[in-house]
Amino acid sequence: EVPELPKEPKAKLGDIYQLGEHRLMCGDSTKESDIIKLMNGQKAEMVFTDPPYGMFLETDYSKIKGSEKSIGFKGNKKGNKYNKILGDNEDFTDLLISNIFKNFKYCKEIFIWGSDYFVDLLPNYGKDGSWFVWNKRSSEAQQKGIGNCFELLWSKKKHKRIVYNFEWFGFLSKDDPKEARNRLHPSMKPTILLTKIIQSYSEKNNLIADIYLGSGSTLIACEKTNRKCFGMELDPIYVDVIIKRWE
């Protein structure tokens, strides 16, 4: 279950939490020193992450802004209000991506959402890896809705190309309607989708690193699949959310 956003966060920058087998840090992924503290001498078998690629970065769609207006096919659902993403008014920095490859170059499996927006920062422009498609819509009516109809996921290793069909119309989802209704983060992914991908490309008890943890869906997916997640999130508010979701 996804909790409400706290008005005043308990977490502070630099805090590290042990959540069962998982490790969570309120830190800055553009700082190599924070990544070293998070990993604490351990090595991940997989990196699975979703960088904040909306930061002053040209994209082919307009951002969905939270509102109190009624939305949906029959106007029967209130719009989600998202907390302002830290750093969203700053220029996109290459460190958001280069730090992944610098600190996890030993990882055979690296999965990065939204890589099509910074393909020039991927090894050999992403040609050596594979691309996966998450198709969010299933009907023509949904295709005309606000926001992207699909998202791309790049993997460092060559895999069979797959299209994952999981409806996620911002607030509607046949697969997990409760999670979709309670969506708190603008780039939040359905846990059921992350669970399927993580199960397919990692083993039980593997350590999965996510240095852009957001609302914590990767950690929850790891909990459900008997993996360990070492995650980092810059915003103390979302660190509190992650802890509440795990509890």
At which residue positions do the language-model features occur?
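Class I S-adenosyl-L-methionine
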Residues: 1-15, 20-25, 29, 33-49, ...
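Nucleic-acid-processing active sites and adjacent nucleic-acid-binding tracks
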Residues: 83-93
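Short, conserved SAM-binding segment of the class I
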Residues: 92-103
